[in-house]
Each structure stands twice: as structure tokens, then as C-alpha cells.
A protein has these predicted regions:
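Active-site capping/gating regions of soluble enzymes
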Residues: 1-3, 10-12, 16-188
Length: 188
């Protein structure tokens, strides 16, 4: 069983139809255009591999009513390259143990939340994508965020719109995860 969908077996116990959700992760790119290209390329590869094996695949946000939908959580952060060549994560605070995010990082999340109603039509542009954003399926249902109760422990609330992702020992890992996109969101 994956995402609340049970595999369909025939009377001999052989799989007749398998319904599963697969999660695909890849390393981020410092180039936003390359990141969008990677996402599109991954979708094409998955579709072709399934087709070559006689299987169907869908990237719909809510292919089956009553079970968890398909999200495409998008992580974003901002880095600067100093004259010395060193990369600095602009969302990381100076003291990772005392603060959750830098003032720029807090400003970024505040701007996203404030303007999300204007941004959302580009993210959730179909009825199918809006069907995914319902209570009870670990999808965002409100325009809210949570940075966690303590800088050492970010929130893992799966119903928030945008969450803070960080590693207290790695300032370069600080970023936000926007949870509302789906596989048909235009990443570009």
C-alpha cells in the first residue's frame, strides 16, 4: 500500500494492476533554468521508461479521489558568491543555534505568504491541482508557515504552505520548501 492505494492482485496473488506513488529527488542546481530543465527531463524519462515496460504513469495532482495526491514540493534558497569566491547562503542566520533564518530569509517567507494569492494561479492552475489541496491528505490547506519551536528543530507540519528546511551544522542547507506545487506546475 502506498499513499492509501492498495495494489490490485489477481486470484493467484499476481499483480494485475499496481497503483503507487514514487518520489524522485535530485541534487539542486545553482542555475534556476537548469533546475526547471532537470524537472522536465525527469518527467520525460519516467514516462518513457514506463511506456517501454507497458506501464502507465500519470503526473496528475489528484489522480484518485480519496487518497493522497501527487505533490512536487519545490525547495528554494538564495546564495551569494563573494569576491573571494566563497558562497554564502543568504537565508542562513549568523548564529544557527539561536535563530531560524536570516532577516532576508524571514523577509522572503513573509513576502511569499503576503502575495501567495496572486502567485497561486501560476502554481495551482488546474482544477485537478486544487483538488489535491484538501484537508486530511498531508497537503497545504492554509497560507501559513512554521519555522519550528526552536532553531534546532524546524517544523515538520505537512499541512503548511511553506516550511523551513535546515541543518544546524550546515548553513548552506537552509532553504524553504513550498509544498503546494504539483507535477504539472510550470517550474519555469
Amino acid at each position: 500500500e502506498v499513499g492509501g492505494v492498495k495494489a490490485k492482485l489477481d486470484e493467484d496473488g499476481h499483480e494485475a494492476v499496481v497503483l503507487e506513488q514514487l518520489e524522485i529527488d535530485w541534487k539542486f542546481s545553482n542555475n534556476p533554468l537548469q533546475t526547471a530543465d532537470n524537472e522536465l527531463q525527469a518527467r520525460i524519462i519516467v514516462r518513457e521508461v514506463f511506456r517501454e515496460n507497458g506501464l502507465d504513469v500519470t503526473f496528475n495532482a489528484k489522480p484518485i479521489i480519496g487518497v493522497a495526491g501527487s505533490g512536487e514540493h519545490t525547495h528554494f534558497g538564495v546564495m551569494a558568491k563573494l569576491k573571494s569566491g566563497k558562497l554564502v547562503n543568504l537565508f542562513s542566520p549568523e548564529d544557527m543555534r539561536k535563530e531560524s533564518a536570516s532577516s532576508l530569509g524571514i523577509g522572503a517567507i513573509m513576502g511569499l505568504l503576503k502575495h501567495y494569492e496572486a502567485i497561486n494561479p501560476f502554481i495551482s492552475s488546474t482544477t485537478d491541482s486544487l483538488n489535491r489541496l484538501k484537508p486530511g491528505f498531508e497537503a497545504p490547506v492554509c497560507i501559513v508557515t512554521s519555522l519550528g519551536t526552536d532553531p534546532s528543530e524546524p517544523s515538520r507540519n505537512r499541512t503548511i504552505l511553506c516550511g523551513l528546511i535546515r541543518d544546524i551544522d550546515n548553513p548552506m542547507a537552509t532553504r524553504y520548501e513550498l509544498r503546494s506545487p504539483n507535477p504539472y506546475t510550470n517550474t519555469y
